[in-house]
Amino acid sequence: MAKAYDHLFKLLLIGDSGVGKTCLIIRFAEDNFNNTYISTIGIDFKIRTVDIEGKKIKLQVWDTAGQERFKTITTAYYRGAMGIILVYDITDEKSFENIQNWMKSIKENASAGVERLLLGNKCDMEAKRKVQKEQADKLAREHGIRFFETSAKSSMNVDEAFSSLARDILLKSGGRRSGNGNKPPSTDLKTCDKKNTNKCSLG
């Protein structure tokens, strides 16, 4: 019996507590939003299969929410990850400043050459914005990675961000692109509905 997919990619979301990692995963995998999720304890993941470049890609998206409060994500979390999404909250400047620490954690624990993506969540809360898009775009360019702003609540750019990372992994595994340096960072300029003020505070 033929497999229902062509490739299996393990993705990992990391970032400070409260930036919305769990909400993003639920939105992507189940197209649902609920701001009363119970914070993740231990390792949890969701699965969704997407079509990219004519291939069926099974994405296994791992959630580290509930662990980052211990200030460490062990090597076990990073093992086998082909793509890592670094998440911050656009209304929380500290969560953005800590992205540098998460970058360091990736360097120390993840496989060399793992694909990375910077993601600013809660862009539906524009009135409470503390991190400007230009700041994040600059950081992404410094690291040679893509950048998106998303809203797990409105679903803005969520599919686009995950699909972009999966496409980069696919192209890299196919040998048609070498290294992150040849990949121009991407900023999605879509705006979110400023009237939406609810937030997902977990993960």
Swiss-Prot record:
Task: Show the segment(s) annotated as Disordered.
Answer: 173-203
GO CC terms on record? Answer: bicellular tight junction; cell junction; cytoplasmic vesicle; cytosol; endocytic vesicle; endosome; extracellular exosome; insulin-responsive compartment
Q: Where does GTP bind?
A: S17, G18, G20, K21, T22, C23, T40, G66, N121, K122, D124, A152, K153
- Is GTP-binding set as a keyword in this record? yes
Q: Where is the lipid attached ((Microbial infection) N6-stearoyl lysine)?
A: K194, K195, K199
What are its cofactors?
Mg(2+)
Known EC number(s)? 3.6.5.2
Q: Cysteine methyl ester is carried by which residues? A: C200
Where would I look for the motif Switch 1 in this sequence?
31-45
Question: What tissue expression does the UniProt record report for this protein?
Answer: Detected in several types of epithelia, including intestine, kidney, liver and in endothelial cells.
Q: Where in the cell is it found?
A: Cell membrane; Cytoplasmic vesicle membrane; Cell junction, Tight junction; Golgi apparatus, trans-Golgi network membrane
Motif Switch 2: which ranges?
Answer: 63-80
Q: Which CDD domains match?
A: Rab8_Rab10_Rab13_like
Which sequence positions carry the modification called Phosphoserine?
Answer: S178
Stretches of Polar residues bias are at 179-189
Can you give the propeptide residue ranges?
201-203
What residues does the Glycyl lysine isopeptide (Lys-Gly) (interchain with G-Cter in ubiquitin) crosslink join?
K46, K58
Q: Which UniProt keywords apply?
A: Cell junction, Cell membrane, Cell projection, Cytoplasmic vesicle, Endosome, Golgi apparatus, GTP-binding, Hydrolase, Isopeptide bond, Lipoprotein, Magnesium, Membrane, Metal-binding, Methylation, Nucleotide-binding, Phosphoprotein, Prenylation, Protein transport, Tight junction, Transport, Ubl conjugation
The entry's Mg(2+)-binding residues are T22, T40, D63
Q: What is the UniProt domain comment for this protein? A: Switch 1, switch 2 and the interswitch regions are characteristic of Rab GTPases and mediate the interactions with Rab downstream effectors. The switch regions undergo conformational changes upon nucleotide binding which drive interaction with specific sets of effector proteins, with most effectors only binding to GTP-bound Rab.
**PANTHER family per the UniProt record, alphabetical:** LD44762P (PTHR47980)
According to the record's subunit comment, the protein's assembly and interactions are: Interacts (GTP-bound form) with MICALL2; competes with RAB8A and is involved in tight junctions assembly. Interacts (GTP-bound form) with MICALL1. Interacts (GTP-bound form) with MICAL1, MICAL3, MICALCL, EHBP1 and EHBP1L1; ternary complexes of RAB8A, RAB13 and either MICAL1 or EHBP1L1 are possible. Interacts with PRKACA; downstream effector of RAB13 involved in tight junction assembly. Interacts with GRB2; may recruit RAB13 to the leading edge of migrating endothelial cells where it can activate RHOA. Interacts (isoprenylated form) with PDE6D; dissociates RAB13 from membranes.
Q: What is this protein called?
A: Ras-related protein Rab-13
Q: Which organism is it from?
A: Homo sapiens (Human)
